[in-house]
């Protein structure tokens, strides 16, 4: 493949073509300095994005300025609302199916698997799986909301590639930063924290982000900065208050549906 790797080239390609070009050029990058072989591809991808990042972000920002900017508050609000409403719709569909399945288990399962099933406690049977599933699914929602900003690249959305341990790439202070984006400051357990340090540590300008400034930090590394809540959203020029308001409405809607299903 003789196509030159440049931001201008990638911009004109489809996501599939971008992925193919990045895969080829990434394979040419020496990664023998990275001890953990599981992170070789992530390191190569990171080097590729670092090389084209500034120009790619410049294109995104200029494109946004030429049109009615997504950073205008009304536009931001509409885009965030669209994503949270779609999330609520899809999660409520899953919730109804889950309740139906759990109800069937309680009514027809001759061999209960736990005390809650034995006692027919429908709400207790479903509550753990619901909150666990909700927390997991919301992880991608933060990426989708962040991706509204022209100062953010989500590699999976933009290039069709997954960089192990990296959720978003952002530009701030004229630097390209590679970040993990979690829901809360205490999202990671001890073993997960150690893995995150390795995954972030292979990149220049790593960053650990909590979407909301809630709880206590479980991630701590002197070489990897961490930010939370409004500080992060301000960094990518999105209005934190809008995000919090739309998330509140979304979760209240899901909570109301959960309560109605439990009452049946």
Q: Where are the language model's segments positioned?
A:
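Interdomain/boundary linker segments immediately adjacent to catalytic/signaling cores
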Residues: 2-140
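Long, charge-rich low-complexity segments
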Residues: 68-92, 179-204
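Catalytic centers of nucleases
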Residues: 136-199
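Catalytic cores of nucleic-acid endonucleases
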Residues: 183-237
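A residue-identity detector for tryptophan
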Residues: 56-59, 94, 142, 188, ...
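Amphipathic alpha-helical interaction segments
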Residues: 102, 150, 240-241
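Noncatalytic linker/hinge segments flanking ATPase motor cores
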Residues: 119-123, 206-210, 218-223, 247-254
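Non-catalytic C-terminal interaction segments of nucleic acid-processing enzymes
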Residues: 238-264
